[in-house]
Amino acid sequence: RTKSKFGARLEPGSHIDIQLYTGRTFDTVTQVESIFNYGEALTDDYSRWTIAGAILEAAERFTSHEHEPALQEFKLATGAMKALAENRYEPSMILDAYLLRSLAVGGYAPSLTNCSKCDAPGPHRYFSLVGGGSVCADCRPSASATPAPETLKLMSDLISGNWESAMESELRNRREANGLIAAYLQWHLERGLRSLQLVERA
């Protein structure tokens, strides 16, 4: 529960320093200091605003255990929001990079070079949601996808932060990466992000 005087500082996309009184059922906001309102910089751009919503929803899903610190996820989320607000890179690529890195922090990083089953050196032709990413011809499950090598290279660039290389990727590979990442995320979170349905991809 909160008092109305804190409303503006508690808008979606706000980076805040907050103090709470812990109650039996609900926590009560007692003090809020605004650090930066990323949402304010994004509200006039529908594409970036919906991507920000997807990042925030994902952050909530990746930090579902209350009262447990999640510093790495916090840094990833604020970094992604800052990059969006400053319009540093193509917005949907910021989202995909954030999702891949959050999966990695959670222990679900997809293998993008070696086979995720037998560790045979890659790159490999097949990608499996069930198998944990790239898989060789001998290990591939029947429902494996066959993404372009450039798509897996793009995903590797995004997870490692190699933006110079990522920005040189072609649109078809970005779109293919979008689909793989969304499907991989849904598999490991057991359900997809509702806000992804609203995201306008390039």
Please state what every model-predicted region is.
Residues R1-A202:
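Non-catalytic alpha-helical scaffolds and adjoining flexible linkers that form interface surfaces
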